[in-house]
Every structure is written in C-alpha cells, then in structure tokens.
Amino acid sequence: MKKILALLLVLALSLTLVACGSGKKDAASAGSYKVAMVTDYGDITDQSFNQTTWEAVVAFGKDNNVETKYYKPTSNDTAGRVASVELAIAEGYNVIVMPGYAFGGTIVEVAPNYPDVKFVALDVAKGDLLETAVANKGESYDYNPDNWKLEDYVDLSNVYCAIYQEELAGYMAGY
C-alpha cells in the first residue's frame, strides 16, 4: 500500500513539473509593455507609497526587460494627474501605475478614453471611483458603494484596482 501511495505521489509531482510549461513567453510578452508610474502628490523619494511603488515598477522592468518611467503631476489635483497620465500615454506607455486613492477621479476621466492602455490603481476603492462617476452623470452620491453599480456609470474594464486589507495589519498590531 505504501509503494502504491509513493508511486501516485511521484506521478502527481512529475505531472505538476511537466505542467510548469516550456519556458516560452505567451503572446502578450512583458516586452511589449512600457510601464509608467504617476505619483500622487509626493515624489519617488517620499519613503512611503510612491517610493515603494516606484521601486516595484523598476524591479519589474529590470526582471522583464520592460521600459519604465515615472511622472510627477505639476499640480495636486485631478487635472494635474490627468495631464501626467495623458503625457505618459502620448509617450507610448501602455501600462499606467497609480498609487493612492487620490487617483479615483483621474481613472474615471482617463481610462474610458484609452481602452488599449492598462491601468493599475493601488488603494483605489469602488467608492473612490463612484464619487466622480456618479457626479459626472449629474447625480448625488451617498458614499455607500453597495448602493451603486459602477458599470452603470463608467466602463473601467481596462482598470485593475488593488485594495489592501489594512484592518488586518492594525488588528495584528493591537489597534
């Protein structure tokens, strides 16, 4: 019985290794991307969100032979962030990384106009997006995202939002 179990385990492991792939890159290889990061109102030496994000973008670029660049908005408002995102796109960057909830309005204004560009938004929640999207339709937002369907207001199919469960770290730290 032990020999049969060991044989099945070896067979399962060998199939797992075979399934790991041939080492070929898929059709949308990382080399076809140019990644830009737009800072919020800080810069890439803030020892916080912007710096951490920029370091990750640079590491990804080096590991995957992808061109990277960062842009700092000239003003601390949605218009400044929109201008920086549009400049990055005009310069050929097709993946835009944006760290922070301040990009909610920027995403709603820019992403639908550039369906071939991918947007990665860090710490941008549904409510951050809804606030601008609902206002753009002339409606009043009640700050309860569960009452709204974002897709009824704006197409953000080219946007990925990563939300951190900050409450878990707070709990573990005793807060």
Regions inferred by a protein language model and the residue ranges of each:
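Short, low-complexity disordered leader/linker segments with a strong preference
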Residues: 1-33
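A residue-level marker of the well-folded mature domains of exported/periplasmic proteins
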Residues: 24-175
